[in-house]
Amino acid sequence: MILVIDNYDSFTYNLVQYLGELGAEVHAVRNDAASTGELLDGGWDRVVVSPGPCTPREAGISVEVMRRFPEAGIPTLGVCLGHQSLAQAFGGTVIRHEPVHGKTTEITHDGTGLFEGLPSPLTVGRYHSLVVDPDLPDALMITAMGGGVVMGVQHRELPAHGVQFHPESVLTPEGKRLLRNFLAEPGTD
């Protein structure tokens, strides 16, 4: 079962739908409806932290989820705000950026993990006004870049990934394949 942390964003249920279409059983919980400790006891196979309209500090349990679930060995994916929450959880910085909403960008990636088997460059849909500072802490590595912005990060030792773009958007034609790669990652199931 997949836990989706809902950061009060309209894209959350696009993620839920895509994951369901890929055969996953999905349960969404608002970022202020339960504690991370309560959710850690839920027997989740994977966790996705959704996009949202705020900063990571304002996103309820999102930053804590992006740290504690991977530390428990549970594969975790952050999308947009979730990606920023991952960076912040491990000592990275989130900075303001010129707003980009409903635009496509070509990104280049490392071809591993989430990006395995996907074309590079890859067309992705962007909706954000915050980004992860590329000066990352040692625990994190950049897996994708586009338009001068960090578009993907991964923890070097834990099963934690983040993407700045929206794989659940129609503007990301290969988004469902990326989510399939996340579901295929070895985990606790």
Where are these regions (language model features)?
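Phosphate-binding/catalytic loops
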Residues: 5, 121, 162-173
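Short hydrophobic/Thr-rich beta-strand motif most characteristic of the beta2 strand and flanking loop
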Residues: 25-31
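Extreme N-terminal starter segment of soluble prokaryotic enzymes
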Residues: 1-3
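Two-component/phosphorelay signaling modules centered on CheY-like receiver
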Residues: 17-25
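Catalytic beta-strand/loop cores that center a nucleophilic Ser/Cys/Thr
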Residues: 111-157
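Short amphipathic alpha-helix with an adjacent loop that forms part of the alpha/beta core around
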Residues: 35-43
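Cysteine-nucleophile active-site neighborhood
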Residues: 42-116, 179-181
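Acyltransferase
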Residues: 170-189
